[in-house]
Every structure is written in C-alpha cells, then in structure tokens.
Design a protein with these regions (language model features):
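Pol beta-like nucleotidyltransferase catalytic core
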Residues: 3-84, 88, 92-178, 182, ...
Length: 297
C-alpha cells in the first residue's frame, strides 16, 4: 500500500492517479484503490476496496493506452482525465485519438497546443518528473568533471545525437564518464550525477515545453547541464546555470569550455535551478492540482 496522506474533509472530491501501464484491458472496476497514487491525499472512505467505491464527484487521472480510449468503464462512476506526457514524436497516435475521443474524458492534460486548442476540455501540462528519491540524503560531492548517461536506444533524434557525442568522447579520450544501460550500468540515477560538475543532457527529441527527468535530476543534484532539448527551456529555468546547445558542434564547444572555474561561476544559478527543479519534478501533484483547480472555477 502507498504511504497514506489523509485529506482533511472526507467528503471532498478525491483525486487519484492510475500508475503508468496499470489501466487493465478489461474490468477497470476491479482495480484496487491501494494500487492508485494519491498526490493530494486519500480520504478515509477510500482506504479499501476497488474503483467501484469512487463517487461521481471523484477523479482519476490516467496515462494513455488504447483501452483508455475504446473500452467500457462499467461500474466506475468517477470522472476520468487523460495525461499525455511523452513527446509528440512518440505519442502522436494518442494525440490524434485524444482529439477524436476527448468527450470521454473530464480533462485532457498535454503540452501539445494544437490539441488543447482543438478541444473544449484541454489543459496545458508539461512533464518534468524525476527518477530520484530521498534527495536530501544524497551526498553531493563535485570531485569529477562530467558525465553522459545513455541507453542503447537509437531511434529518435536525441538518441542519435547522444551516440554521436559518445563516439566523439571516446575517439578523443575526453574526460567525460559515459554511463548507463548502453555502456556502463549503474545502480542508482544519482550515481551518474552527484559527483559530476557537468553532465551532457540530451532529450530524446527537441520539442517546445518538453523536458524530462534527464534535466530535472541534473539540476536537483547541482550539476550544470550541457543541454540539448526544449528550445524554450528558459521559460522554466534560469539558463545562466546551463550551457544551451542546438547542435553537435555546439556540444563539442561546450565540452571544451568545462572547468572548475566555470562551474563555480554558475553556483548562484545552480542553486536557484535546484529549487525550481523540485517543483517541476512532482508532475503527478501538478496534474492533480490542475484537476482540483478546475473544480473551483
């Protein structure tokens, strides 16, 4: 069971999240309330049972899967909202389905402005997120220069750019630790960031308003991102604490300028971005707050 944070008024609308890939193909109603996530708290009336106990005033937020759009929701009275968080290049099919079947949802949360403008129940929402836990207990000791975390994936523009940079690093024996499932596996995400002053952060695709735990986790652990990704990232962070790159050549140049002195010159903005990142990290709470605010309008 999830750690329970109780809400004060048991009769207030409850807002819960169905975890990623947990929406069943059949019999949605059988999903246990214990399997849900409760970012804003869980009422006493819902401490046990399944989705049938939810009232028509309650709310569920889910990630997209085909059954979410097409299948019946027998015995489930709660409102259901959809949260599309992956880049358009990956979830373009779900964006198209959301336009067609938006009437099946209370709200549709997405960064895709075309989708939001085309439906009446769209709400702007960006992803963010984090892979870290117990951040205050992580020992941050910047004794190493730089890292690059990568998997073996190679289908999207960011994947390809990542591997191109890695080839360059290895060929010229540059002082950057290349780690991750595709190279040198590590146990915890923080192991690839906590001791490094810089990290080459390349999103899987470059899309407006799309940034992920790749960037958030670097900021949370006071690592300067050499960043390729959202072209409007300055809307979310103070980029004086970043090195923004738009190409392979710019990444190469940024790498050549790494130094202890440069890192120390950015400390003010590194600390500022750490605080900002803590807000962007909790995307589930932000999603639940959007639903809650809509009830008060």
């Amino acid at each position: 069971m999830n750690t329970i944070h109780m809400i004060k008024n048991d009769n207030d609308p409850a807002i819960a999240i169905i975890p990623y890939r947990s929406w069943p193909v059949f019999r949605l109603w059988k999903l246990s309330l214990d399997s849900l996530e409760w970012p804003l708290g869980r009422p006493k009336r819902l401490l046990s049972g399944d989705l049938r106990k939810l009232k028509k005033e309650d709310h569920l937020i889910t990630f997209p899967r085909k059954p979410v759009f097409f299948f019946f929701r027998n015995k489930v009275k709660a409102n259901i909202s959809l949260m599309i968080v992956e880049p358009d290049i990956i979830h373009k099919h779900y964006i198209r389905l959301a336009k067609i079947f938006n009437w099946r949802f209370y709200k549709i949360l997405s960064k895709n402005q075309n989708l939001i403008k085309s439906i009446n129940n769209g709400k702007f929402f960006y992803f963010g997120s984090t892979f870290l836990s117990n951040i205050n207990e992580i020992d941050i000791n910047k004794k190493d220069m730089a890292s690059l975390i990568a998997s073996a994936q190679n289908q999207h523009p960011g994947h390809k750019l990542r591997h191109e940079v890695i080839t360059y690093i290895k060929e010229f024996k540059i002082n950057i630790a290349v780690i991750g499932r595709g190279y040198k596996p590590f146990e915890k995400k923080e192991d690839g960031l906590k001791s490094y002053k810089y990290s080459v952060i390349i999103e899987n695709s470059s899309e407006v308003n799309y940034f992920t735990e790749k960037l958030i986790d670097a900021c949370l652990l006071e690592t300067v991102p050499i960043y390729w990704g959202a072209p409007n990232i300055s809307d979310y962070f103070d980029v004086k604490g970043f090195i923004i790159c738009e190409s392979f050549e710019e990444i190469k140049y940024a790498i050549s300028k790494m130094s202890d002195e440069d890192y120390l010159s950015r400390i003010k903005w590194i600390k500022k971005n750490k605080k900002t990142a803590s807000y962007h990290a909790d995307f589930k709470k932000r999603a639940a707050q959007i639903i809650k605010q809509s009830l008060n309008n």
